């Protein structure tokens, strides 16, 4: 379907204005994982019983995609990476445009996909399923995520967004359990509803602008006419609601906790990080052209964005406080953190866009570390991550500091507490665009959410630092306690090491991350 949409669009554009310029190297962030998925299936046909080649091919494809996005992220001229362009068209009439923020998001989501792949590789002995299919689905989702971030035409944008989502549904249900099937069905129904809303929003957008492109020229023309402006605002609000399902914003969040709990933990990590970064990129593609077009005072778009952000922050934080299961805590934390990611976008400024991307990357790094720890804790003889209760983590920082320490750092980052300076800076940067835009009520509510969030994460940190409980072994014949094991596989070790190092370095010198984004 993606290929047909792209071919039809390119054919129509070519007929109107001549040849389309295509630079395959600039498409590498999406092209590398897409080709990698095909190569994995080919390798599986030649060596069906080997798993290491699948992992190597998948990792190399994701690394190549991230390398392909580096020039755009580090461009000193801050010029977007353009391809699939028509000569002489408005705004270059490019279907692919990846500015520095877009390229940074592509690197982040490809890195998060690689982390999820490494975590999943540790569980291949315990989980049923075809390993080649697992890798191919993760690569397909990564290709869709990288494409939607840079897509500047609604047809491509919509198909790429679904490509980033649908493979994850299969990854959830491939576990083969009734619980996984329920989580996958919940995610699929949510995805279908989201797609329907997005299609309606797309139709309204074309009705308002007369164009399927996400170009500033078409938006400025529609904004100048009051009637078209009203339809355009309705279109962007409808599209925002559709993306609200992808971002787990309240009240579109109901699928998140059951899906996180029912699927394999590495896939939950993929949903919480890479999928969210792709949705943020899709949202930025819609909102970015509105910077500077809105009236100086808050209007409907800013109000809706701010209301959904604050609602997500407060609801997610309050419910997370009651969580006694680490995965449920991370699920409700994802809802709360999604509100923080969207909050600076209410300012409708480029500064707000940078703040949103910075917060999304900060959350993704901390979330991956937390999920890596969750995969390492299990009941004796159980599946990875099978022991998720609060009691199982009591004293983990003392008994297993190499696992408990990174989890404490991740929770401090999410709470915005020192010594995790990165989390504190991320929250300050997220609030600052609101103050500059005069949205003081939103800023005050955000501060309240910070205070509530501290209580959530400090509760878990206190458990991690407490004295470990004495647990009996099965050989003792005493059933007074459950034996909890900590087994860190090679993939989890890599994610823990790199993720913790990133959080430490970014907390010591946070200006490095925020300097790159500015």
Predicted regions and their residues:
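Alpha-helical transmembrane segments of multi-pass membrane proteins predominantly involved
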Residues: 2-518
